[in-house]
Each structure stands twice: as C-alpha cells, then as structure tokens.
Design a protein with these regions (language model features):
Chain B
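Residues forming the flavin
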Residues: 1-365
C-alpha cells in the first residue's frame, strides 16, 4: 500500500515479517503541528518489552518516565527538541528524528547506524526503506559518534522530503556491509 | 581447600551470585571452563533491554567486563578459569580438572549456574561442515574476529537468530534469509525490524529442507510449512549459502544437577528438564542453589537477578546476614524480577515458573 511511509503493508505485518505496517506507523506519527515546528523524534516502538532507556536519555522531559518498565514510550512532541539523544540510547534502534523544516526540498533524518566505516560528512549515501528496499540517495549532514566507542553512532542525512517517513536505513555505495542483500 | 560457596559457571548468573554472596561476607570459589569469565556475555555486542539503572542500553560485552572486574577485585572470591567441574560428591566436594591436573574442592554450599546448550535440528546434510550453532558463529566473529563464511541461511527467528544475523551483516557477511517454522517471529519486533531494513527477509512458516554439498555446505533448500509443520512439496527454493546457522533454541544444562541427585522436572516453557527450586533459588537438596539458564531458559537480565537472589540466600543460610535484612533485600530483587517478567512476551516463562512453584508448594503442603 502506498502511503506516507512508502510501499508498506496496511496492517498485521510486524510479527510475520519484521516490517511495521501503515497502521503501526500511523500510531506513532507526530501530529502536524509538531512536524511543522522542526526536528522531532519518531518512536517506532510497537511491542511491550521491558525497556526504558529512552525515558532516561531525554533531557527535556519529552519522553515520560516509565511507571512500568514494560510500557510503550509516551512522548510529548511539543517538548521534543529533536536532539537525537534517544536515537543513540534506544537498545532496539527503533527511534529516528525527522526534520521536515530543513529546506523547501529536503528533510533531515537521524538514524542509528552501527556499521563501519562510518560515512563522512557530505558523502552521498544510499537510503533504504523498512523492508530494506533502495528508495533513493541522501547526503550526510553530520555524524554523532557518542561518548565512547561502544555507543551507537547517529547519522543525520539530508534526503528528499518525500523520503522523510520512508527512509530508515543507509548504506555506503558499493559498501561491503550491504553487498548481496 | 574448603569454600563457603562454590559457584559452577562464570556467566552472568554465576558471577552475580558470587558477587552478592562475597559482598555479604561469604568466601566464594568460581569455576569456569573458559579462560575468560563472562559466559555468553563475552560475545554479546548488542545493547541490553531492561532498566537503565540496571545496565539497559549497555552492550553485553561491557556488562561482562564490569562483572568480571568486580569479581576479580573482590578479595573473598577465588577464581578458577580453564577449569571444568567433573562431578559432585555427597561429601560436598567437587572434582575439578584444571590445566594443572585433577583435584577436589569442598564447599558448604553450591550455586550451579551452568547455562544451556543449543538444540540441534534434524535435516539431511546437517552433519556437513558449515552447519553451525548460532553460539559458535558468534564466538568466531565476536571473540576471534573470524567470519564463518560468505553467505548464511539463519534457521530460527528468536532473539539469538535475529541478533546474530545483524552481527553477521556488521561483519560484512551476507544473510540470505532467516527461516522461522512458526507463523510469528520469535524474538523482539525491534530486532526483527532492525534486520529487515537491512534487506534480510524473515520467512515465517518456513524451514530448511536439506543442506547440499559433498564435503562442506554448498547450498540449502528451504520450503514452506503447513499448519502441522510439515514441508509443502512444490514450495522448495534453493539458496546459495556456505553457512547454515542454527538458532533453534536452548535447553538447560543440568548434567551436574542430575548427578548431584537434585529433583528435576520437565517444563517445556523453560526449555526442558529443570531443577525444582524455591523462591530463594535453592533446590530440594539443601545447600544446592541454581540460577540462570540452568534453572530455565530466559535471558541475561533475569539471570543476573536470579544469581543475586541465590547469592543473598546463601549468605543468609550461612548466617552472614540477619534474616530480616535478607528478606528485605530479597523482596526488592524478587519484585524487580517479577516486573521484568510481567510483560506480554514473558507469558511463556511465567507459565513455566508457575509450574515449578506449584510443585514446590504441593510437596510442602
């Protein structure tokens, strides 16, 4: 089904294929007012598992503290600054930041990226959707490496605006890490 | 040499138990057959779930390093690495084999945290070189820095299958597919989504039919399964792989417990035969405690908590801490444990532990 998220199943696909459905993603889509104000975190976390680091990582109180460690995260998008701390903190690599206000044609997408070599600033990267299909190209805006070498690097990519909610992984052109799949 | 507690198995459960006991005044020996303490943590490069205040977001290798450093810095703990426990004797001694030979050590109490072993799968060609357990693939890559091959079929979509697929890709190895016999992915959805967006297909209701190759794996045939898990003729697909990685589940490693005469029971939800034990992790043989996968297949966060409960209970049993302090601290740990297990994905293990609890209560009542 063609949607804001690209060509994804309408529902019930997550547990049979690993691909979140349009229905799953609609449930975590930031409201229009939040998307218009600047960068905002998108928590693609759909399953209750015991996990709370996103709530701890947020310095702005936007992601509420968990009363039950199994709860799904709850975010106050108007408090979210899109800083990306939660992207690096999420053990499930399920959080992204999207900025649709970056320029008239382009958006910024922050993605967790645990592959070496890390891309360089301004390098052209290939973008993939949630099913791993190549959907376009972007350019690296910045790379946030984190405090220690075990931290999850976060790569901010400039991408065509239409890919803001489509692209969720990146690869280097002719990268060994991606060959074959 | 007599110790107050002998811990067999230096993984997350054993080390947590050893530390908790030693911090409460118990003289402990830890025995592990590997050269390095940490158990499976030494190869777990993914970030843990759970509470931030308890290592969530920290990679397994780092948790293992912290536990190891704490154990090595604890003067009440003696560590025997490269040492295998061969057998338990009724005089409370343990026959051990180290590079320097075979000897006996005696303990007032024991904590068996011996972990688990991988399940094998039956299919033609499963004896060919190139068919690996997921643990071996992880050891090769993450401990020794060796790629197991160039192209992999992963069998099983539990967390181990998903995580190892991701790590294979990080190492630059192709993963052609993950096949899963059940209609649903077994592991966490976040792990599944993480490998799916790398382009690795996860095929539910699929399994391996056979492996091909004369002297080693040169390919595999997968097929679709019907509702009774029988392969459907005509759905076969040949895939080009030189590695078949089996992540088809674990079963508790209870040999020493059997041999020590601990009462065991079959609990499918916990992976097979497990010891019968109470809320303090003590088996029906007084002074023999269990924790971790040997007590039921789960994961490292709960294993560490169970280890701590066992270590604390040993300290109380030996009179190192007053009863009320033990109960207070134990209840906090037990509450954390039940909170970790309270989610919808833990319903299977909850059923398993309820079975054990009912057995214990039945025997006492």
């Amino acid at each position: 089904m063609k949607s804001l998220y690209g060509d994804l199943p309408e529902k019930d696909s997550l547990l049979s294929s690993g691909i979140p459905s349009v229905q799953d993603l609609d449930g975590v889509l930031p409201p229009a007012e939040a998307r218009k104000k600047g960068p905002v975190a998108v928590l693609e976390c759909f399953q209750k598992i015991p996990c709370d680091p996103c709530g701890q990582a947020c310095k702005f109180g936007a992601i509420k503290e968990f009363s039950d460690v199994n709860d799904l995260p709850v975010i106050d998008w108007m408090r979210c600054t899109g800083c990306g701390q939660c992207v690096a903190a999420c053990p499930g690599l399920a959080i992204f930041v999207v900025d649709e206000t970056y320029s008239p044609e382009e958006c910024l997408i922050a993605m967790p990226h645990e592959f070496v070599p890390l891309p360089e600033r301004d390098q052209v990267v290939l973008l993939y959707d949630r099913a791993g299909r190549h959907v376009g190209e972007g350019a690296v805006h910045r790379v946030v490496r984190g405090k220690d070498k075990l931290a999850t690097p976060v790569v901010w990519v400039r991408a065509p605006k239409a890919l803001a909610y489509v692209a969720r992984a990146l690869g280097l052109p002719e990268s060994q890490g991606r060959s074959g799949n | 040499m007599e110790y107050e507690l002998i811990v067999v198995g230096g993984g997350p459960a054993g080390l947590s138990g050893a530390l908790k006991a030693a911090q409460n005044g118990v003289r402990v020996a830890v025995i592990d057959r590997q050269e390095e303490l940490g158990g499976q943590l030494v190869k777990q490069t993914h970030k843990f779930f759970g509470w931030s205040r308890r290592n969530a977001g920290v990679r397994g290798i780092e948790i293992g390093r912290r536990l190891r450093d704490a154990v090595l810095a604890e003067p009440r703990i003696t560590v025997f690495t490269g040492t295998e426990a061969l057998g338990y004797y009724p005089d409370n001694s343990l026959l051990i084999e180290s590079p320097s030979g075979v000897s006996r050590i005696t303990g007032k109490t024991f904590l068996f945290a011996t972990g688990a072993q991988e399940r094998m799968l039956l299919f033609p060609g499963n004896d060919l070189p190139g068919v690996y357990g997921a643990g071996a693939v992880q050891t090769l890559m993450n401990v020794y820095g060796v790629r197991p091959g160039r192209s992999v079929l992963m069998v099983g979509s539990g967390n181990i299958g998903l995580i190892v697929s991701y790590q294979l890709r990080q190492a630059g190895v192709m993963v052609r597919a993950i096949v899963e016999a059940l209609p649903q992915i077994g592991g966490y959805a976040v792990h599944a989504s993480k490998v799916r967006r790398l382009g690795i297909p996860i095929l539910t209701r699929h399994s391996i039919k056979e492996a091909h190759g004369r002297e080693y794996v040169e390919g595999a045939t997968i097929w679709e399964l019907d509702d009774k898990f029988r392969g459907i003729p005509g759905t076969e697909k040949d895939i080009d792989v030189d590695v078949i990685c089996l992540a088809t589940g674990l079963t508790p490693l209870g040999d020493l417990l059997w041999q020590a005469g601990v009462s065991m029971t079959y609990v499918p939800e916990l992976g097979g035969f497990v010891p019968i034990y109470d809320g303090n992790m003590e088996t029906e043989r007084s002074g023999i405690f269990v924790a971790g996968d040997a007590a039921g297949i789960e994961e490292a966060s709960t294993a560490m908590l169970c280890g701590e409960i066992a270590g604390l209970a040993v300290a109380a049993k030996l009179g190192k801490i007053p009863r009320h302090r033990f109960e207070e601290e134990r209840n906090v740990l037990a509450q954390e444990l039940s909170a970790l297990r309270s989610g919808p994905l833990s319903s299977k293990v909850r059923t398993g532990y309820e079975r054990i609890k009912a057995l214990v209560q039945g025997r006492r009542g």
